[in-house]
Swiss-Prot record:
Transmembrane segments: none annotated. Residues 1-44 are annotated as: Disordered. SUPFAM superfamilies: Ribosomal proteins L15p and L18e (SSF52080). It comes from Ruegeria sp. (strain TM1040) (Silicibacter sp.). This is Large ribosomal subunit protein uL15. PANTHER family: 50S RIBOSOMAL PROTEIN L15 (PTHR12934), LARGE RIBOSOMAL SUBUNIT PROTEIN UL15M (PTHR12934:SF11). GO terms for biological process: translation. Keywords: Ribonucleoprotein, Ribosomal protein, RNA-binding, rRNA-binding. One of its GO terms (cellular component) is large ribosomal subunit. Residues 21-35 have a biased composition (Gly residues). Belongs to the universal ribosomal protein uL15 family. Part of the 50S ribosomal subunit. GO terms for molecular function: rRNA binding; structural constituent of ribosome. Binds to the 23S rRNA.
Length: 156
């Protein structure tokens, strides 16, 4: 099979109904919109308007707070780092944030990169990142490597 031979399954995309094309079509004249009124005209309804009743979004109390300067980290799991090391896309000798971005493992750094412990990790690697979970640090040291966190390095 070639790309130009690909076809939708029969009935996968039903024929579009052409509205307002005469009485014989079954969807002529009003085109299924009924008679007059706001809904028959273009623009349809006003979202969130409940006919004068206090709308839901006003009935419920305001709650919570969004921190305007909250740090957003790019998250990477150890299992994925291991895959990239096995594939030869990452050098286990020294893994930095820049090398993670260059390898395509992380799209962009954001406010830093945080390593989490999901997945198997067996490589003896030296990793330097902005943040890491305790279990990730343990997993790397158990494999014989070292995971340094930028905040700890700055404190020393």
């Amino acid at each position: 099979m070639k790309l130009n031979e690909l076809r939708d399954n029969p009935g996968a995309s039903p024929k579009r109904t052409r509205v307002g094309r005469g009485p014989g079509s079954g969807k002529g004249k009003m085109g299924g919109r009924g008679i007059k009124g706001q809904k028959s005209r273009s623009g349809v309804a006003i979202n969130g308007y409940e006919g004068g009743q206090m709308p839901l979004y006003q009935r419920l109390p305001k709650r919570g707070f969004n921190k305007p300067n909250a740090k957003k980290y790019a998250v990477v799991n150890l299992g994925l780092i291991q895959k990239f090391i096995d594939a030869g896309k990452l050098d286990a000798a020294s893994i930095t944030e820049d090398s993670l971005v260059a390898s395509g493992l992380v799209r962009r750094k954001l406010d830093g990169i945080r390593v989490l412990a999901k997945g198997e990790f067996t490589a003896k690697a030296t990793i330097a990142v902005t943040g890491a979970s305790k279990s990730a640090v343990e997993a790397v040291s158990k494999a014989g490597g070292a995971l340094t966190v930028a905040s700890e390095a700055a404190a020393e």
